[in-house]
UniProtKB/Swiss-Prot annotation:
It is found in: Periplasm. Keywords: Metal-binding, Molybdenum, Oxidoreductase, Periplasm, Signal. It comes from Caulobacter vibrioides (strain ATCC 19089 / CIP 103742 / CB 15). One of its GO terms (biological process) is protein repair. This is Protein-methionine-sulfoxide reductase catalytic subunit MsrP.
Length: 306
């Protein structure tokens, strides 16, 4: 795998040698899982790092990121995903990409990792519950994957689906949600360069409790939009059904952009608690990514289309 510099990066955007070596652990970890194409020579290629999209805020500790999670397929408590995901098998793994496109295909996770240019991006993550983290993800832009299947003019939205494995995901035995978990984006949101398909964090492979082996990261939206353990991506003409919106449409809108001016019916969204900090901080519109994404919603009433 040739890990190339992203076209918008300069020499100053690429990490120094110590971080370059640190990021080799991702490919080494992939190789240890038996992923084809992740040899030592590939690991030496390193990863690119885009300062243009990454926040300079201090990342949340890896311990907090991997032990304080919402992943209802493994249970509803924050500690359940880490405690109950040990039996989950993220390899082998394939993802079906279909719908309104000219070249639908099924692709293995090894090909997704081996044939896409991986980047580390440090993103803020804001949960709809009023807490937040800063997470150093490793992944590739979703737009690159979608472009490979050649979307047609009928592709107005993108629908995502999580794997259904009750034997490995004990939370799916309960009717907490209408399983499998489903999410969706508008096509322009999906094609936005900020939208990431994550395969790792902190320079290592993605842990089970964080959505292994492949999850969506949309940093200007509330965290539940970041669907985990994805097995299907469909380009569709109509707005897709999404799990939390079906359960409680007044509380969880399809768009779910981070908006401190639009409260959840049961709590304020004006402030948030950063995990690892004591004091609450003000929540930023679009989670601080407004300069890149606000234009997509300029003509919309964000209180109506929440």
């Amino acid at each position: 795998m040739l890990i190339r510099h992203a076209p918008d990066l300069t020499d100053n955007d690429v990490t120094d040698h110590s971080l370059y070596l640190k990021r080799r652990t991702l490919m080494a970890g992939v190789a240890g899982l038996g992923v084809a194409g992740a040899s030592a020579s590939h690991a030496q290629a390193g990863l690119t790092f885009s300062r243009g999209f990454s926040t300079t805020e201090k990342p949340t500790s890896k311990e907090d990121i991997t032990t304080y999670n919402n992943f209802y397929e493994f249970g509803v408590d924050k500690s359940d995903p880490a405690e109950n995901s040990g039996k989950f098998k993220p390899r082998p793994w394939t993802v079906r990409i279909d719908g309104a496109c000219e070249a639908p295909r099924t692709v293995g996770i090894e090909d997704l990792i081996g044939k896409n240019k991986l980047e580390e991006r440090i993103y803020r993550m804001r949960c709809v519950e009023g807490w937040s983290m800063v997470i150093p993800w490793v992944g590739f832009p979703l737009k690159d994957l979608l472009a490979s299947v050649k979307p047609t003019s009928k592709a107005k939205f993108v629908a995502f689906e999580t794997v259904m494995r009750p034997s490995e995901m004990p939370g799916q035995a309960w009717n907490t949600l209408d399983w499998p978990y489903r999410e969706g984006l508008r096509i322009d949101e999906a094609m936005h360069p900020l939208t990431l398909m994550a395969v790792g964090l902190y320079g290592d492979v993605l842990p089970n409790q964080n959505g292994a082996p492949l999850r969506l990261v949309v940093p200007w939206k509330y965290g539940f939009k970041g669907i985990k353990s994805i097995v299907r991506i469909s380009l569709v003409e109509k707005q897709p059904v999404t799990s939390w919106n079906v359960l409680a449409p007044r509380e969880y809108g399809f768009y779910s952009n981070v908006n401190p001016a639009v409260d959840h019916p049961r709590w304020s969204q004006a402030t948030e608690r950063r995990i690892g900090e004591f004091r609450r901080r003000e929540t930023l519109a679009f989670n601080g990514y407004g300069e890149w994404v606000a234009d997509m919603y300029r003509s919309m009433d964000l209180k109506r289309f929440y």
